[in-house]
């Protein structure tokens, strides 16, 4: 019999298993059949007895008394052992060491799968409520106040909606077929919201006013055919146009177009600005940029200005934050009153960009913009900065009264000293053009470049009072005949491009007749620029087509010489000016000599050009590259779709429309009342002779918007009073500016330019 000490030695903490391991395997099998309980009871004794019997068979029934006491402890240990061993790969130690990355991936998969499932379930739960909550205007609008466009829908039994070709902050643009006129049109659908409606009504009024004074569509302004309300949306019906000038630039890989083609664009734009400056219009576009200048036809150089959504009349200005940044004039940057001269600044910037392929002043913000202007043009005159509310945003005044640039806060951008980045070098006047790419080309001589540079410097005059005006720009030697007839436009076709298009196709939207396919949108940060025209086109590479662009030329027609008008002060006879644009109508103006405006030259050796884009990125294709076009406000963006056909159906919209934030209204005109600007603002351009009485008013009923500068009577703005002893002065044009056809042709400056419209950004 064992003693108590021996019994104590057999406790679980000190049991010796070696003698009994011979039956351990049998114990495992038996343990699998035993109840898993941590309480010991007499009910388990029979099982223990069975184990003992099994164990005795292995130990020859030796030490039976000891086994009787050890067996309960062995069974307990066996119960704690796993019945089956797990895969080593699932061991926690392995998961947290060798397979740690795999563990993290699994956690992410499980987590995000659950999150995605919950999100989908949540969407499913409120999908029905969402429709009920966000569909407005009896189900015709979405939650953004935009009309829900349905392809193939027919409006008013007249317009068949083809597709959405553009979308912006103002609303949308669709391509539609007009069954009545049997032509393609672009319909601008304004958002169903009061603020957008009000602004669009201003645009409609200005467009109708311009179209009223340009019934023959001679002056390069987009034609508003009609407008109507449809399901609470104001809809503007425009002619269809083609590519914009930014598309053209992009398709030259941003190398720029020839000086010849740049000249043709310049003449048409100056003519358009001259038209806008007529007293009964006095319209400031406020957002000129390449995106807002569209080709009428992809085969011709005729252009039109679009997007008057930001425009205003002189004296009716409502915005202070205007113009795309790259093209923003100094007076706008400095917070000064502005007038029509801001559009001339923008034009100067555009023309340089069209030839060089790159923006002259591509500022990332207003401070950067001003610094880049100063690099080229130097510090603005002190008399301007002294009056500028925002001068100290960019400059600091020294004790001696002079101004210097402020150092940038970040200190990252380093600029060239003021006025040291010469326009002479930017244009490559003596080095074969930009990058030397025009060396040896006809029409790109040093003399040609010197004329171009001089015109640009006059357009980029810091002082809006002395900045060249459209009338005098058209007289510049850059547009005059030279020994090389191919370098200017004076012998180019004088037929109105809009009329040519209409005559050749029967409609003003013929270029869009073959446009088809669905519209595409892609993201432009704008640009596109910004920043921002809605167009749709069917335009693959059309190398053959561009060779035909702008190729017609005609010998100038002998024009009647008008007698000198009465009423000019001074002894000098009035200057007779022949204005020829390609393919614009020839116009003879009789004007008083304005020496200060005609012969002035900017004090700085190089003038500044700045350029602001709508926020919209243009995505170039392949080697074309991308260029961001920042936009001045929450502007519409561009969208396009590319098809295989060559022709282009292009909406007239550049889609830089409404400002998302209304700035303080400014109704006071800037002080621009010098003799030169008087001629600028009041140079009538009409089909018939315009007669002015002593009060300067035409023999027509002027509306409240006509000649607002005269009505406001602001100091510094002459009211066109003529001496009482003189007769009425006549601004004369050739009656109904003749339209001519010709057969002579010159080589197209577009030869070799492969124009392909790639998707433009939309946001």
Curated annotation (Swiss-Prot):
Keyword annotations: ATP-binding, Host-virus interaction, Intellectual disability, Kinase, Nucleotide-binding, Nucleus, Phosphoprotein, Serine/threonine-protein kinase, Transcription, Transcription regulation, Transferase, Tyrosine-protein kinase
Keyword 4Fe-4S belongs to the record: no
First-tier enzyme category under EC: transferase
Region described as Disordered: 32-57, 115-136, 408-442, 485-540, 596-679, 744-763
Tissue: Ubiquitous. Highest levels in skeletal muscle, testis, fetal lung and fetal kidney.
Region annotation Histidine-rich domain (HRD): where it falls in the sequence: 595-625
Regulation: Inhibited by RANBP9. Inhibited by harmine, leucettamine B and leucettine L41.
Residues found modified as Phosphotyrosine: 111, 140, 145, 159, 177, 219, 319, 321, 449
Residue span, Protein kinase domain: 159-479
GO cellular component, one term: nucleus
Catalyzed reactions per annotation: L-seryl-[protein] + ATP = O-phospho-L-seryl-[protein] + ADP + H(+); L-threonyl-[protein] + ATP = O-phospho-L-threonyl-[protein] + ADP + H(+); L-tyrosyl-[protein] + ATP = O-phospho-L-tyrosyl-[protein] + ADP + H(+); [DNA-directed RNA polymerase] + ATP = phospho-[DNA-directed RNA polymerase] + ADP + H(+)
Disease cited in the entry: Intellectual developmental disorder, autosomal dominant 7: A disease characterized by primary microcephaly, severe intellectual disability without speech, anxious autistic behavior, and dysmorphic features, including bitemporal narrowing, deep-set eyes, large simple ears, and a pointed nasal tip. Intellectual disability is characterized by significantly below average general intellectual functioning associated with impairments in adaptive behavior and manifested during the developmental period.
Name of this protein: Dual specificity tyrosine-phosphorylation-regulated kinase 1A
Naturally occurring in which organism (per UniProt): Homo sapiens (Human)
Lineage: Eukaryota, Metazoa, Chordata, Craniata, Vertebrata
């Amino acid at each position: 019999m064992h003693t108590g000490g021996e019994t104590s030695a057999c406790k679980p903490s000190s049991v010796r298993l070696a003698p009994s391991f011979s039956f351990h395997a049998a114990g495992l099998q038996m343990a699998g059949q035993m109840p898993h309980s941590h309480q010991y009871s007499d009910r388990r004794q029979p099982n223990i007895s069975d184990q003992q019997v099994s164990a005795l068979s292995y130990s020859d029934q030796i030490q039976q008394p000891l086994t009787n006491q050890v067996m309960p402890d062995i069974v307990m240990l066996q119960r704690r052992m796993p019945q089956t061993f797990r895969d080593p790969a699932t061991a926690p130690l392995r998961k947290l060491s060798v397979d740690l990355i795999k563990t993290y991936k699994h956690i992410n998969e499980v987590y995000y799968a659950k999150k995605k499932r919950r999100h989908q379930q949540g969407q499913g739960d409120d999908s029905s409520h969402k429709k009920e909550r966000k569909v407005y205007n009896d189900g015709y609008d979405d939650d953004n106040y935009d009309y829900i466009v349905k392809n193939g829908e027919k409006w008013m039994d007249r317009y068949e909606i083809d597709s959405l070709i553009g979308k912006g902050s103002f609303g949308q643009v669709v391509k539609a077929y007009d069954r009545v006129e049997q032509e393609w049109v672009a319909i601008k659908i304004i958002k169903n919201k009061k603020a957008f409606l009000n602004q669009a009504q201003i645009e409609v009024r200005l467009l109708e006013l311009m179209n009223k004074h340009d019934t023959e569509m001679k002056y390069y302004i987009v034609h508003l055919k009609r407008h109507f309300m449809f399901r609470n949306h104001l809809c503007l019906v425009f002619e269809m146009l083609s590519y914009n000038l930014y598309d053209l630039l992009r398709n030259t890989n941003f190398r720029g177009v020839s000086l010849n083609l740049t000249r043709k664009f310049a003449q048409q734009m100056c003519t358009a600005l001259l038209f806008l400056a007529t007293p009964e219009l006095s319209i400031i576009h406020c957002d000129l940029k390449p995106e807002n200048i569209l080709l009428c036809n992809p085969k011709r150089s005729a252009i039109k200005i679009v997007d008057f959504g930001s425009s205003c009349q002189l004296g009716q200005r409502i915005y202070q934050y205007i113009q795309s940044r790259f093209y923003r004039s100094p007076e706008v940057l400095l917070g000064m009153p502005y007038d029509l001269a801001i559009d001339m600044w923008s034009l100067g910037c555009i023309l340089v960009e069209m030839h060089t392929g790159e923006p002259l002043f591509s500022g990332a913000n207003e401070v950067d913009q001003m610094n880049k202007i100063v690099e080229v043009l130097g510090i603005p005159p002190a008399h301007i900065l002294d009056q500028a509310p925002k001068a100290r945003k960019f400059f600091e005044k020294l004790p001696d009264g002079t101004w210097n640039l402020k150092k940038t806060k970040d200190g990252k951008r380093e600029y060239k000293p003021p006025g040291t980045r010469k326009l002479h070098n930017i244009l490559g006047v003596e080095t074969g053009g930009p990058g030397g790419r025009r060396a040896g080309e006809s029409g790109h001589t040093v003399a040609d470049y010197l004329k171009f540079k001089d015109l640009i410097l006059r357009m980029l005059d810091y002082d809006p009072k002395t900045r060249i005006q459209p009338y005098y720009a058209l007289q510049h030697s850059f547009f005059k005949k030279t020994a090389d007839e191919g370098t200017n436009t004076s012998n180019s076709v004088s037929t109105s491009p809009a009329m040519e298009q209409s005559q050749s196709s029967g409609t003003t939207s013929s270029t869009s007749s073959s446009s088809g396919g669905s519209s595409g949108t892609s993201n432009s940060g704008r640009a596109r620029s910004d920043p921002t025209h809605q167009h749709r086109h069917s335009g693959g590479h059309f190398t053959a087509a561009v060779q035909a662009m702008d190729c017609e030329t005609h010998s100038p027609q002998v024009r009647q010489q008008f007698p000198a008008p009465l009423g000019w002060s001074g002894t000098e006879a009035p200057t007779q000016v022949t204005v020829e644009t390609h393919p614009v109508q020839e116009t003879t103006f009789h004007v008083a000599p304005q020496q200060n405006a005609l012969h002035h030259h900017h004090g700085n050796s190089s003038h500044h050009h700045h350029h602001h884009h709508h926020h919209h990125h243009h995505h170039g294709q392949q080697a074309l590259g991308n260029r961001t076009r920042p936009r001045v406000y929450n502007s519409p963006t561009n969208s396009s779709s590319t098809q295989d056909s060559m022709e282009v159906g292009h909406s007239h919209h550049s889609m830089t429309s409404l400002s998302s934030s209304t700035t303080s209204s400014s109704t006071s005109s800037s002080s621009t009342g010098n003799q030169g600007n008087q001629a600028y603002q009041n140079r009538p351009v009409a089909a018939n002779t315009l007669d002015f009485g002593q009060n300067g008013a035409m023999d027509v009923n002027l509306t409240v918007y006509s000649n607002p500068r005269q009505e406001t009577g602001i100091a510094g703005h002459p009211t066109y009073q003529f001496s009482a002893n003189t007769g009425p002065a006549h601004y004369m044009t050739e009656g109904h500016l003749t339209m001519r056809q010709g057969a002579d042709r010159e080589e197209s400056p577009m030869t070799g330019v492969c124009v392909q419209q790639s998707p433009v950004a939309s946001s």
